[in-house]
Curated annotation (Swiss-Prot):
Gene3D superfamilies: Winged helix-like DNA-binding domain superfamily/Winged helix DNA-binding domain. It comes from Shigella flexneri. The modification N6-acetyllysine is found at K80. PANTHER family: UPF0502 PROTEIN YCEH (PTHR38768:SF1). This is UPF0502 protein YceH. The gene is yceH. Belongs to the UPF0502 family.
Length: 215
């Protein structure tokens, strides 16, 4: 597969994909905006504490690889970054809104079950039911230009199998059988996480508004 992202590159791209959908008024992002998004405590696994220089290094590498591009001028006092990873004018990778939501959540949190993905991706795309989540995952796993996700072997004692993206190369865990299983989204933790994400984004918007009022 042609995509070989490091863990930090995956985090940066995932953040830009997320913010493009959830906070479009703040997108593209400055370096500081990317740092804040990368180190966000909600909807991130693992939680990171990257410095500005570490993030800048990743941004520079991704620009060179044509996964990002810089945006400047027209009144912008600082350089900002936008993703060209998917759905860009000249890029090959085209994803639906549902596919973007799942891929982004996998880039930001690693392997997850369909139930977890449905809950955690809700800010980007509202899946009508679990069948739509599973169908989208199956499409990503069987695309001619992919595969982009893989189903992992079910862990002992677990009812659900997890899925992982393949943009960082092959996953060590072996895929289980391809049959889909129906999941019930009743996990309290994922609901709490969804609320935490919403609160964090509201706070970010409020901070941005206060900053504009202070100018």
């Amino acid at each position: 597969m042609k995509y070989q992202l490091t863990a930090l590159e995956a985090r940066v791209i995932g953040c830009l994909l997320e913010k493009q959908v959830t906070t479009p008024e703040q997108y593209p992002l400055s370096v500081n905006g990317v740092v804040t998004a990368c180190n966000q405590k909600t909807n991130r696994e693992p939680v990171m504490n990257l410095s500005e220089s570490e993030v800048q290094e990743q941004l520079d590498n991704l620009v060179k690889r044509h996964y990002l591009r810089t945006v400047s001028g027209f009144g912008n006092r600082v350089t900002k970054y936008e993703q060209r990873f998917c759905n860009s004018e000249f890029g090959d990778l085209k994803l639906s809104a549902a596919e973007v939501a799942l891929i982004t959540t996998l880039l930001l949190r690693g392997a997850q079950t369909p139930g977890e993905l449905r809950s955690r991706a809700a800010r980007m795309y509202e899946f009508s039911d679990m069948a739509e989540v599973e169908s989208t995952l199956e499409q990503l796993a069987n695309r001619e230009d992919g595969p982009f996700v893989v189903r992992l072997a079910r862990e002992p004692g677990k009812r659900e199998s997890r899925y992982m993206h393949l943009f960082s190369g092959e996953v060590e865990d072996q895929p289980a059988v391809t049959a889909m299983s129906n999941m019930v989204d009743g996990d309290l933790q994922t609901r709490v996480e969804a609320l935490e994400i919403e609160v964090a984004e509201l706070k970010q918007r409020l901070d941005s508004l206060l900053a504009h009022l202070g100018d």
